[in-house]
Amino acid sequence: MQKFTFFVSCAKGIELLLKDELERLGISSQEKLAGVEFEGSIKDAYKVCIYSYLASQVMLKVATDKVINQQDLYEFISSINWMDYFAVDKTFKIIISGKHYDFNNTMFVSQKTKDAIVDQFRNVTNQRPNIDTENPDNVIKLHLHKQFVNVFLCLNIDSLHKRSYRQFQGQAPLKESLAAAILIKAGWLEELKKHQPILIDPMCGSGTILIEAALMAKNIAPVLLNKEFKIFNSKFHNQELWDNLLEIAKNSQKVTNAIICGFDIDNNVLDKAQRNIYQAGVEDVVTVKCQDIRDLENEFESEGLIVTNPPYGERLYGDQLDELLDIFNGFGDRLSQDFYGWKVAVLTSFADSIKELQLRTTERNKFYNGAIETILYQFEINEHAQFKHETQLEKNIRIAEASAQKSDEHIDFANKLKKNLKSLKPWLKQTGFECYRLYDADIPTFAVAVDVYSEHIFLQEYRADATIDQNIAKQRFYQAIYQIHKTLDIKYENIHTRVRQRQKGKEQYQKENDKNKFHIINEFDAKFYVNFDDYLDTGIFLDHRKIRQLVAKAAKNKTLLNLFSYTCTASVHAALKGAKTTSVDMSNTYLEWGKNNFTLNNINAKKHSFIQADCISWLKTNKDKFDVIFLDPPTFSNSKRMDDILDIQRDHELLINLAMDSLKKDGILYFSNNYRRFKMSPQILEKFNCENIDKICLSRDFLSNKNIHNCWEIKYK
């Protein structure tokens, strides 16, 4: 089979990717500027035209020579036997690229080339081929470089990057071939080797990245989508070979279980994306949804790849740059919090936006989207990903103070803090409490709980309702931080935050970080260690302070069984009154914390029992009897250490019966839970003397939340 030299052009920056792509097609090539060169057959060149996602033009190299003036140019073009390449009845057009030392006018070069070709045909055949700039049979390309002229015959009449599916596009369209390049560079081909590949584009625009990813996943040859594709009409063209290769490509498509999802905040753009997806025939693989990137959630079973090409700063955002930077800041937060183990690639020309992600790049590569120079930034979301030049505290302060400038609705929150503090002051003075709840979602738009721990604040955000704009909810949360700092004169570093919501993946059952900072607080005559940053809760439930006192008073100089004991705060209060205590909990961490609480209060922990066990299983085998039992189970638990899932409404009858089996006949069981819709079992009410003591156990600072817990005193009849 006859061999030729071919040059395959591409966008600057993706030459190595194109070289690798040709290797996968079985073609060895050499990297050149804006393309690659290879020796091969027409069949090899056809394969590139059909299968390449990255190529722009496949060109047969005709000749190269040094040219210093217009006569040299005419003679050089005339020296090529054009009748070996195409017939006189075939049309052609000429395109010029590059720069020449001696020719400033490319139209002049094009005219001289046309004259030389036409004159040659006329001199030999007495006929001349016609020029057709719209739909030619052949395209002749001259590339000028210094004093050299390179002549090529293009196999594809129009650029290969045009796939014909993009009927609708946004303001800043991404070339199809560049979208394919960043996908390959980001690792999509490796991702496709997984059992279920996952790709997300959280700012998908008209869907180009999504569609290119789907084409690769389904092994769809790009040329099959180009309804206007035209191969050259040269004497070297083999129509039968071309048709056979196209048929093989059609039969090579496959079914994929890849998950490819796109999100965008603009419904109009998404409508265009959806139509493009249908046009490309990949609607079975690609889904799109209207969503702000700052609300991005990981709802997938395994790690995947995020690839996106966001708007380019000033070019699209103009005077809304602050909004763009805030978007990237929120995007960085979502990646750090919810996408552990994922890989991320962001193509942008706006470096300031990348800084807002606050993530370390693993790789940077320069690409060109037309004339726009862009950078592909790649990240791996792991323990090393967080960028250190801005601490989390510094970031929180910056966002809090910026949020305070966006609206003044936080003034109402500040006024409520002042009002509540004024109302509680007499009670605080009387009791001496330094830990209390100051605010509990008193204003619906500020759905937070503010707990004061002396000079520290534990701020819990209740997860916003699905109908609430998540960005507004986030803004209000940071406004709350700002007002707590300003109104209560609390240092920013002493404001500790927590969001109550479902945890996933790496977030579950793990300490928040490695700070391991404990603080000492006072409650009545006891001291306790609390930790604001490392665990889901602080180590003490403030709403239980009264029932802890009831338990301690009842257990004075007696025996106490503390079930689901957590950090053993009730046990400490009882021990200070002379009780011998047994604390049972599944968590060794919390039991050790409890022992430290005993030591903090100068109580010999060795004289008390600390048992790590599933309380239900332990109660079933326990033979000891106790004077007082404190039973304070969680509303729901599915810990791996438990034999079964605990549901307090379903299981409280079993729990109470088992606990009563360990209670002396004249003893007292204090039962508490925080399930707001709790209903006591009629069988328990019938079997034992049960008294609801909610009102007795409700402290002054929790009066606005009267259903915060259910408390019962239970005795034998």
Curated annotation (Swiss-Prot):
EC number: 2.1.1.173, 2.1.1.264
All copies of domain THUMP, residue ranges: 44-155
CDD domains the UniProt entry points to: AdoMet_MTases, THUMP_AdoMetMT
Keyword annotations of the record: Cytoplasm, Methyltransferase, RNA-binding, rRNA processing, S-adenosyl-L-methionine, Transferase
A GO term from the CC aspect: cytoplasm
Cellular localisation: Cytoplasm
Subcellular location, principal: cytoplasm
Catalytic activity: guanosine(2445) in 23S rRNA + S-adenosyl-L-methionine = N(2)-methylguanosine(2445) in 23S rRNA + S-adenosyl-L-homocysteine + H(+); guanosine(2069) in 23S rRNA + S-adenosyl-L-methionine = N(2)-methylguanosine(2069) in 23S rRNA + S-adenosyl-L-homocysteine + H(+)
Gene3D superfamilies according to UniProt: 3.30.2130.30, RNA methyltransferase domain (HRMD) like, Vaccinia Virus protein VP39
Family (UniProt): Belongs to the methyltransferase superfamily. RlmKL family.
Described purpose of this protein according to its UniProt entry: Specifically methylates the guanine in position 2445 (m2G2445) and the guanine in position 2069 (m7G2069) of 23S rRNA.
Official protein name in the record: Ribosomal RNA large subunit methyltransferase K/L
Gene that this sequence comes from: rlmL
